[in-house]
Amino acid sequence: MSGILDTVNLRTQMVGQNRLELLLFSLETDQVYGINVFKVREVLQCPELTEVPRQTTSVKGLAHIRGETIPVLDLSEAVGRMPIPKEDHRQCFLIVAEYNTRTLAFLVRKVDRILNTQWDQIMAPPAEIGVENYLTAVFEFEDKLIEILDVEQILADIYPMHTKVSEALATPEMKVKAKAHHVLCVDDSSVARKQMQRSLEDLGVKVTTCNNGKVAWDMLNNLAEKGNDVTELFLMMISDIEMPEMDGYTLAAMIREDPRMHTMHIVLHSSLSGGFNVSMVKKVGADGFLAKFNADDLASVVIERIKKVEQRS
C-alpha cells in the first residue's frame, strides 16, 4: 500500500510542473510508441478473447477483466499497420485505458518500460508528414524517435462522436447571444479540436484553436504585450491537459500567475475522467473540469459562462 501511495504522491507533485510518465510499447515493427500513464488503468497478458460478430475489423473481441467486459482493439491494425496474428494474441499484452469516459483495451506486441520525462521535451509531429496521420507528438529517447499516437483520432474513426448540439441548448435566442463571444480551445489532438470547434460553432460562438499549451501561451502573451485585455477578448479558455511542449496544468498555472490575464475563466478538458483530475484542476487554479467528449456537456459549460458574464454586465 505504501508503494501505491508513493506513486500517487509522485504523480500529484508532477502536476503543474510540466512533467509526465509514458508507458513505452511496440506493435508489429521495431518502432516504439508511448501512452500517458495517467490514462492507463493496468497492463496485463492478453487473456482469451470472446469474438464479437460483425464488429469493426480492428476490434478483436471482448476481454473479461475483474468482472468487467472490455472491448479489445488491435492498435497496430487501427493505425493502418499489419494486424497482430490471432495465434499470437496470448503472447501479447493489453493496455487497459480510459478515453472519453470509455474503458478500452489496446492489444500491443510488447510493453517496454515507464519513462519519466517533461512535456517540454515532447514535440509536435513534423509539419512535413501532413495532418492525415495518427501522431499527436514525438520525442527522442536513447537515440530513438518515440511516437505518441493520437488515440482520440483512432477512436473517433472507430466510434464516431456526435458534435451536434441539441436544439434544447442551441436555441435561436442563445445563438444570438453566443455570437458576441469568443472561446479559445487548446488541444494537441486534431480530432478533439475539430469536435470542439464544430460543437461551439453550432452553438454560435466564435472559436480560436491552438494545438498545444505553448502555442496558446505565446498567443496570449503576444496579445497582452500589445495592450489587449485577453479576458475581454475571450469568454473563456477550454484546454486539454496532456499536450506536448506545455501541458494544460502548466498553462493554467502560468495564466493564473500573470496579472495581465489571471482572471481568465479556464476549464480543463480531458479524455481521462475521475476524481484525480478534478482535484488537480483545483490545485492549479482552473475554474472547472470537463470530461471528453459530449457536445451538450461542452455547450452547457459555455452557456453557463455566457449567462454569468451577462448577469455582471
Where are these predicted regions, by residue range?
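An acidic, low-aromatic, low-complexity terminal/linker signal
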Residues: 1-237, 241-250, 257, 262, ...
